[in-house]
Structures are given as structure tokens and as C-alpha cells.
Amino acid sequence: MKEHYQGLGHIAIYTKDMDESIAFYEKIGGALRQRASSPTPDGDKLLALVSFGGFTLELIQSPTPMPLTEGNVPHFAVYVDDLDAAAAAVRAAGVDTFMTPEKKVLPGLFGGLENWFFTGPSGEQIELLHML
């Protein structure tokens, strides 16, 4: 069965404000691929797909507010080739929600990595990840 898998399809997260979230993810390098809506008994659910090269983020805005808690997806990670340059680009785009003042360097974890977390407009945690 594994020969049929072609990679990660997308990661879905809830958002409080679709337009704000799309603008945020475009500002940090994502590209809006598609917008759609899906009817529900409570009204239309808004959907958007934002591409980041190797993966897609699906944004979902429910017509009835969803509790935005850590839940089953505490964060998502984006591989970067240069952590310092990627963090500088995010900051240059106006994002000032980094969760720590400095990156973490963890040489013994998963063969060695460095990372930096920041938050998106609905409180979602985003990890910039560079494998050493």
C-alpha cells in the first residue's frame, strides 16, 4: 500500500478571520492557491489553500466559532535552508510574534536541529525548522 502514497497532502487549521490569515501567510511567503466555501446547516464554511513549496496549509473558518486550542495539532513546521535568514525574512514582513528571543539549537535531537517558533493570527504555532 505504501507505494501509493505521494507525500503530505495538507495540514488543516482553524482560523478566526480568513482574510487576515490569508494575508498573514502570504506575507511570510505562502501563495494562495484556491478559495472555496462549503455549505453547512449553520452557514458557509470558508476554506483556503495556501502553498509553501513542498506542502499546503488548509485554512478553515467555521460559521460557528470553533474553540482555538492546542488540540491534536500543537504546531506545524516549515523546513528552511537557513534559519537565521528565514527568521529575518519573517520579521521583515512585520511579524513580531516569535515565542522566544533566540532560536533553539538541539544537536542531539533527531540527528540535530535548530528551530524558532512564532504564532499566526489565530494563535497557531509555526516552527521554522533547519536540520543540522
Model regions and ranges:
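Vicinal oxygen chelate
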Residues: 1-4, 35, 91-132
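N-terminal beta-strand motif that seeds the catalytic metal site of vicinal oxygen chelate
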Residues: 1-19, 73-76, 129-132
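Exposed loop/turn and edge beta-strand positions of beta-sandwich/beta-sheet ligand-binding modules
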Residues: 7, 44-46, 72, 112-113
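Long, charged/polar, surface-exposed segments that mediate recognition or autoinhibition
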Residues: 77, 86-91
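Core segments of cupin and vicinal oxygen chelate
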Residues: 3-6, 13-56, 85
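Short N-terminal helix-initiation segments at or just after the protein's N-terminus
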Residues: 15-25, 59-70, 91-95, 129
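Conserved short beta-strand elements that form part of the metal-binding/catalytic scaffold
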Residues: 33-70, 118-120, 125-130
